[in-house]
Each structure stands twice: as C-alpha cells, then as structure tokens.
C-alpha cells in the first residue's frame, strides 16, 4: 500500500503534488536529473539496473507496484530534502 511509506501528512501532501502525476519514465528521469546514476538508483531501491533502463527507454511502461513504490519513495526523499545525496548508498555504483 503506497500510503504505508508516509509517516507524516506533510509528506503525503508533497507526494500528491510531486509524484502522483508522474509516469515511471518521468520519475526515473527526475532521479537522473538529481545527479544519480542508474547504479545508484539500483543501490538505493533494490531495483536492478536493467529494469531501470527498460523503464527509462519505455520498454516497460507499466512496472510492478513494488518497483513504483521504491522509485517514488527515493524520489520523494530527494524532493523533500529529507535524504541528502551524500547519504545515498553508492556501494553498487560504478
């Protein structure tokens, strides 16, 4: 359930404004625009890099709900500045 990832009403309102209207491609593009690589997105979401690439290229236009929740959670954390890029897990990043 998407609501379960939000601890505060403020975060829910931010989510509605920033994530709800974005497609999977737009969310991945926004994460990349924040300076993340596909490998860093993988390290922080658990979504394999090939899956991220398929979303980005439009080959997978309807990813699993668990994939969307993971992408949306990372996007929201970055969008609300509650998660600085210096704290990102870069262990799998090349």
UniProtKB/Swiss-Prot annotation:
Residues 38-57 bind DNA. The keyword Cell inner membrane does not apply. One of its GO terms (molecular function) is DNA binding. SUPFAM superfamilies: lambda repressor-like DNA-binding domains. PROSITE patterns: HTH_CROC1. Residues 27-88 form the HTH cro/C1-type domain. Keywords: DNA-binding, Transcription, Transcription regulation. This is Putative protein P2. It comes from Acyrthosiphon pisum secondary endosymbiont phage 1 (Bacteriophage APSE-1). The lineage of its organism: Viruses, Duplodnaviria, Heunggongvirae, Uroviricota, Caudoviricetes.
């Amino acid at each position: 359930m998407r609501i379960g990832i939000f601890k505060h009403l403020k975060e829910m309102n931010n989510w509605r404004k920033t994530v709800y209207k974005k497609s999977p491609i737009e969310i991945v593009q926004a994460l990349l625009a924040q300076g993340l690589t596909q490998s860093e997105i993988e390290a922080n979401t658990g979504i394999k890099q090939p899956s991220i690439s398929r979303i980005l290229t439009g080959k997978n236009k309807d990813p699993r709900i668990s994939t969307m929740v993971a992408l949306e959670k990372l996007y929201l954390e970055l969008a609300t500045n509650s998660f600085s890029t210096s704290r990102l897990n870069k262990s799998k990043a090349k």
